[in-house]
């Protein structure tokens, strides 16, 4: 704590580091399924999480005379958490590991953009090759989910095996709890009257959008992210690589275009 200018200015600054152990977790991944637990897997005190950050507050109070006063204040809190130990086993690839990630982190695929018609044509030519020629000709892109067309989302093949699958998922989203929260404001006083304002903000909070937030006309137009950005979409006439909506398709996500409904960086906001 620090006070200056006859205690008009007050500064409080704290640094913290916490290691929390014996966190109760359900052991649904670390116990083999052949043991018969299934959804009734036992809990165990096996989790370890580390938090570190800082907290600061600055406040200035000034009385100019018997009528006028001014108070200015600001605060900021920063916290970064990460898994040290948990119930997940070590993964095949480093990018899949939970440890070192924040506790609300979400996995998904890395989107590299939208497919162009040229890329789709290149894949069609590659598919028409004989097996011998395929072995010596690089595959234009990794196999995605179902049959993809121009305007569909293209995902990154992290392990370079030519197939997008669970081994290409990595942590892409921190979750909806921000790492930083801040605020500032003032209060101006005159006799028995006062005027105050306060501003608040957050930083580094993310969410993977799904459901009605990414499906135009979801619920018959009564719900869904429809009116604000319906024109911000990929079309053959407007092949915008940065469109909010990739190629639109008709029907349920599981039968019509499963590729564009995968959790990915394309949907992180």
What role is predicted for each listed range?
Residues 1-4, 9-17, 54-62, 70-78, ...:
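Membrane-embedded beta-strands that build the outer-membrane beta-barrel scaffold
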Residues 44, 50, 61-174, 227, ...:
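Conserved small-residue
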Residues 150, 202-269:
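Extracytoplasmic gating/loop element in the C-terminal half of outer-membrane beta-barrel translocons
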